[in-house]
Amino acid sequence: MRKLKMMLCVMMLPLVVVGCTSKQSVSQCVKPPPPPAWIMQPPPDWQTPLNGIISPSGNDW
């Protein structure tokens, strides 16, 4: 049993040493592309055309 523990310790030691000494690479932040032009335009006015088609219930036919 003691020999097994010693063998595990010897096998794990290189993994621990390599894990502590290696540096993780840091990726650069990617700048997002600018928004498309259609997003920057004001929203369309749907209320005005609809008012000509749909009228309040005051008009009785």
UniProtKB/Swiss-Prot annotation:
Membrane topology label: Lipid-anchor
Name of the protein in its database record = Prophage outer membrane lipoprotein RzoR
Which PROSITE patterns does the entry link to? Answer: PROKAR_LIPOPROTEIN
What are the boundaries of the signal sequence? 1-19
**Lipid-bearing positions (N-palmitoyl cysteine):** 20
Q: What does this protein do?
A: Component of the spanin complex that disrupts the outer membrane and causes cell lysis during virus exit. The spanin complex conducts the final step in cell lysis by disrupting the outer membrane after holin and endolysin action have permeabilized the inner membrane and degraded the host peptidoglycans.
**Pfam families per the UniProt record, alphabetical:** Rz1
Broad class of where this protein is predominantly found: membrane
